[in-house]
Regions:
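Phosphate-group recognition and catalysis centered on beta-loop-alpha active-site segments
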Residues: 1-148
Length: 148
């Protein structure tokens, strides 16, 4: 038996990290699973993005936990990587979990923010259970308090 191959933020060397395109490409390239980062928006949507700040990936200043989902969805999360990815949108956790159905494993890193630690843990667990991925999912966080 060989070790599992996990694509960090999807096939992020070829596509914009933490996007549906990157996750689908990881499958095409033969990955067994992928790692993604989950944050919660001001209006309590679960979105997949590593950085809190949108500046680097979109060219628009913003802090994901302080933004509403509809505003985030208007931003382009792809063109920073290459013009061919222009128009790539920030995915919701639910969209990413749908893609994860085709993989053996999904590694979800929780990005806690201020008073939302407990909420993000509970909401991510519920989403994983709703998607039927409890046997494939691993949850991690750099914030120990979020995992208690």
């Amino acid at each position: 038996m060989r070790p599992l191959i996990i694509a960090h933020r999807g096939a992020s060397h070829l596509a914009p990290e933490n996007t549906l395109t990157a996750f689908r490409l990881a499958k095409t390239l033969g990955a067994d699973g992928f790692e993604c980062d989950v944050q919660i928006t001001r209006d309590r949507h679960l979105v997949v993005a590593h950085d809190y700040l949108t500046d680097l990936k979109t060219g628009v200043h913003g802090n994901i936990p302080d933004m509403d989902f509809d505003d985030l969805r208007q931003l382009d999360f792809g063109k920073w990587k290459s013009p061919e990815f222009a128009g790539e949108k920030i995915p919701t956790l639910e969209e990413v979990l749908e893609v994860a159905q085709d993989f053996r494993m999904i590694h979800i890193e929780l990005k806690p923010y201020l008073d939302r630690d407990e909420e993000i843990v509970d909401r991510v667990i519920d989403a994983v259970l709703d998607a039927g991925l409890e046997e494939k999912a691993v949850l991690t966080s750099f914030e120990y308090g979020a995992l208690r």
